[in-house]
């Protein structure tokens, strides 16, 4: 479980503690007010901040590598929707968190990273210009000083929420223990511009949808952030439309008419139905190359309208309407009458359990051509074995092609991908720890590859410490599978793409977990037995999967790139 220190009782006429009455303490007090948890790793630059918080019993989870400080906070936000907070020391500590900070920026995660920084007198031999480094990743840095410590910390949280982006709050080393001074005036934060719905756009889109024979609605994370999924489902139900989501909004509609995740993770029989749509309304999703299967998700004849309140990235052939999402969808709902008959009447099988389960064309043999387990068969079996009330967290790597396709989740905040925006691996253990803190009542399931697992291995211990009940599934092909299928298949030498076999179950046991190695589907029974008898603890399942089975999204990518 997450460790927090015990609050020290106050004593009469006690000497002032070193973490009281200074800039770091003021920042800490605002963090305690604005965030529900702090994720970090202590060093010279943030020790006073952390001490102030842990002394008072504020929830704090320590990472073992700074990369996990931000990935924990990132995943905490994705699992709860609340703003998150992380902290590192200056220099090397900040640099270690840079990849996960860039991921948070590209994934549009509102969090505040409180970082120690160089003193105001200038860079020391072991400092870097952290503000410039953050700017290179598109992240704004604010600086806490004696005259603005409280106000600027509030500003950092406000800015993160308004822009849906990470913000760095720097505490210069020589100011951390400085006493507060006369408050400096702080200009009000400019209001975020509104994008009201144009009535002409509403009338036109409502007419297009009402006139469609096979309407489909695709929702992304933007629809979740706008709290627009309920009215959007209302629009779909009136039209008799089918639904799809982005991976970050999985199961947002909670509807039997949901075809699942759009893009490279779409099941083949569901894809066949989706491609029949004649009008598609895309709400709060980017329609990037992965979502559109490199432009093949829908045929060219499909009319696509994309609604979002962010600038148009210019991807795909969709007509773009910039508008605040929820008001726009509520306006549509008022304009669309109930339709009959509908597309749903012509495809009743979509709502049936048989359609939502494995399709005969996807039925997988137990083993791949090399005699190791077929990952499709493994993950399909795990969907039946793992508790239904689960959070599924994924690291990055070739293996991501199977978990989103075969593992169901109870709500859109239970499918967590950290690393995909920046195309990074190694963030799994930290992300899973953040999810365990955010949703302790659920079983946290981390699905990782062996390459990413080894990269982030230091924070397996963090995951064990932060998790009430969890399962680590390592889909272990003894390789960097993505590179193997993209480049070795073209004749490049594979030596650097291969990894000597590692027994992650043994590593987990050494750190206090239970676990086993699986070479057959029958070996998954050990996990099933453990789940039946344990309400707490972590189980590490190392699955020896085939190097010869290629994920569908990877095959699409290779084909698109030629």
Model region roles, listed by residue range:
Residues 23-24, 32-34, 41-44, 49-54, ...:
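Active-site diphosphate/adenylate-binding microenvironment
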Residues 65, 123-126, 192-206, 262-265, ...:
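A general structural motif
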Residues 49, 177-181, 252-255, 355-358, ...:
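Short acidic/His/Gly/Ser-rich catalytic and metal-binding motifs that mark active-site loops
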Residues 2-19, 23, 167-171, 182-184, ...:
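Phosphate/pyrophosphate-binding active-site segments
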Residues 2-339, 388, 469-472:
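N-terminal alpha/beta PP-like core and its mobile active-site loop of ThDP/TPP-dependent enzymes
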Residues 122-123, 313-314, 322, 329-330, ...:
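Thiamine diphosphate
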Residues 41, 64, 88-89, 144, ...:
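Small/polar loops that bind or transfer phosphate-bearing groups
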Residues 116, 283, 307-308, 394, ...:
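Active-site flanking residues adjacent to catalytic metal/cofactor-binding acidic residues
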């Amino acid at each position: 479980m997450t460790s927090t220190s015990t609050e020290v009782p106050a004593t009469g006429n006690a000497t002032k503690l070193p973490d009281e009455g200074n800039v770091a303490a003021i920042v800490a007090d605002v963090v305690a007010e604005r965030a529900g948890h702090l994720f970090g790793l202590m060093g010279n630059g943030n020790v006073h901040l952390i001490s102030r918080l842990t002394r008072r019993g504020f929830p704090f989870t320590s990472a073992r590598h700074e990369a996990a400080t931000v990935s924990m906070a990132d995943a905490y936000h994705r699992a709860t929707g609340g703003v998150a907070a992380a902290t590192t020391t200056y220099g090397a500590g900040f640099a270690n968190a840079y990849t996960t900070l860039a991921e948070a920026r590209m994934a549009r995660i509102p969090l505040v990273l409180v970082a120690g920084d160089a003193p105001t007198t200038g860079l020391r031999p072991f400092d870097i210009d952290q503000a410039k480094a953050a700017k290179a990743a598109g992240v704004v840095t604010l600086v806490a000083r004696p005259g603005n410590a409280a106000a600027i910390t509030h500003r950092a949280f406000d800015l993160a929420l308004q822009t849906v982006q990470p913000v760095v709050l720097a505490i210069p080393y020589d100011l951390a223990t400085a006493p507060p001074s006369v408050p400096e005036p702080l200009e009000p934060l400019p209001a975020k511009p509104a994008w009201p719905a144009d009535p002409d756009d509403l009338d036109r889109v409502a007419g297009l949808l009402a006139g469609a024979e096979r309407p489909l609605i695709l929702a992304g994370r933007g629809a979740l952030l706008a709290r627009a999924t309920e009215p959007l489902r209302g629009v779909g139900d009136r039209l008799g439309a089918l639904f799809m989501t982005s991976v970050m909004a999985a199961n947002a509609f909670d509807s039997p008419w949901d075809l699942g995740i759009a893009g490279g993770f779409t099941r083949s029989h569901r894809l066949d139905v989706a491609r029949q749509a004649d009008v598609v309304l895309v709400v709060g999703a980017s329609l990037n190359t992965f979502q559109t299967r490199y432009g093949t998700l829908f045929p060219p004849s499909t009319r696509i309208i994309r609604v979002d309140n962010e600038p148009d990235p210019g991807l795909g052939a969709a007509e773009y309407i910039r508008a605040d999402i929820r008001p726009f969808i509520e306006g549509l709902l008022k304009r669309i009458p109930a339709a009959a008959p509908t597309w749903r009447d012509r495809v009743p099988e979509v709502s049936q359990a048989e359609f939502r389960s494995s399709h005969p064309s996807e039925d997988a043999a137990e083993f791949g051509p090399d005699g190791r387990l077929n990952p499709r068969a493994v993950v399909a079996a795990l969907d039946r074995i793992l508790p239904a009330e689960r959070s599924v967290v994924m690291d990055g790597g070739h293996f991501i092609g199977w978990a989103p396709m075969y593992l169901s989740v109870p709500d859109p905040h239970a499918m967590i991908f950290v690393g995909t925006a920046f195309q990074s691996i190694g963030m799994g253990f930290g992300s899973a720890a953040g999810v365990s803190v955010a949703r302790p009542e659920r079983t946290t399931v981390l699905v990782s590859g062996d390459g990413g697992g080894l990269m982030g291995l230091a924070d397996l211990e963090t995951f064990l410490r932060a998790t009430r009940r969890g399962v680590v599934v390592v889909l272990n092909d003894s390789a960097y599978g993505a590179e193997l299928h993209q480049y070795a298949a073209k004749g490049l030498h594979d030596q650097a793409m291969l990894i000597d076999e590692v027994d992650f179950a043994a590593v987990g046991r050494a750190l206090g977990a239970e676990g086993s190695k699986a070479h057959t589907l029958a070996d998954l029974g050990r996990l099933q037995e453990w789940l039946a008898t344990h309400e707490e603890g972590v189980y590490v399942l190392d699955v020896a999967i085939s190097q010869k089975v290629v994920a569908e999204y990877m095959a699409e990518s290779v084909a698109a790139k030629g």
